[in-house]
């Protein structure tokens, strides 16, 4: 069998037992990492909303926040979630798609009553809304324990943010809402940092901005010479290969052979 060298997009000629078969080489199309886009959409919109909650900017900025919620916080995260689906990343796909739709739903809760399509949501309804999103975020946070520390910070501070928003709605305390706003700024800033870190580290090919990667410790597996079985219950049908050709073991398997 002979092979001809080829470049991307070329055909590969394979001579097999006197026959020549043309094999089309498909160009692999890779997807860029969508996480920074989703994290920036989430982080920047969260910071702007919570600057308002903290009382740093007044209610005249609400239009800007709604626009960010529709496009960058909402649409950008949904796009990132779809890209994560294509990459087979269930965590990223679920997180980005869900929080993108969260921003759209929040904009809907604010705009639909003003447009006459629904009644304003009461404090109990908003508290239940934030409770469910907090519960979802806590479940997602559990999964981040297998990921990096920076991502854990994003989800933990977001979990705290949702429950502080819930309590703020139930209590009606303006001081607590302002405190919640500052916590939300921290949450959004942590997402922005992680996004910039992922971009920078990928461009430079090394960890320039630390994100606290968790390294899994692999268990050491002892090696066994040919003809010997690893410790454990005997395997039915297994017989160690006898030495051949002047004492050399048969090279078929590092643990011997099946007969």
Label each region the model flagged:
Residues 52, 79-83, 105-119, 136-143:
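Membrane-helix exit/interface motif
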């Amino acid at each position: 069998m002979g092979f001809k060298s080829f470049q991307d997009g070329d055909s590969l000629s394979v001579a097999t037992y006197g026959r020549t078969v043309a094999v089309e080489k498909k160009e692999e199309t890779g997807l860029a990492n969508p996480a920074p886009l989703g994290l920036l959409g989430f982080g920047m919109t969260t910071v702007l909303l919570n600057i308002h909650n903290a009382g740093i900017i007044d209610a005249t900025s609400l239009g800007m926040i709604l626009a960010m919620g529709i496009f960058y916080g909402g649409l950008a995260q949904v796009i990132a979630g779809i890209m994560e689906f294509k990459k087979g990343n269930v965590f990223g796909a679920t997180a980005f798609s869900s929080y993108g739709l969260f921003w759209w739903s929040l904009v809907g809760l604010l705009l639909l009553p003003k447009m006459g399509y629904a009644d304003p949501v009461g404090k109990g309804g908003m508290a239940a809304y934030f409770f469910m999103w907090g519960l979802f975020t806590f479940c997602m946070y559990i999964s981040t324990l297998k990921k990096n520390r920076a991502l854990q910070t994003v989800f933990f501070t977001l979990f705290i943010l949702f429950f502080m928003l819930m309590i703020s709605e139930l209590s009606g305390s303006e001081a607590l809402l302002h405190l919640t706003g500052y916590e939300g700024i921290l949450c959004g800033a942590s997402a922005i940092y992680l996004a910039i870190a992922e971009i920078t580290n990928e461009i430079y090919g090394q960890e320039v901005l630390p994100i606290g990667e968790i390294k899994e410790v692999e268990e050491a597996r002892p090696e066994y010479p040919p003809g010997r079985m690893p410790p454990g219950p005997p395997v039915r049908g297994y017989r160690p290969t006898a030495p051949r050709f002047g004492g050399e073991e048969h090279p078929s398997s590092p643990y011997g052979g099946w007969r």
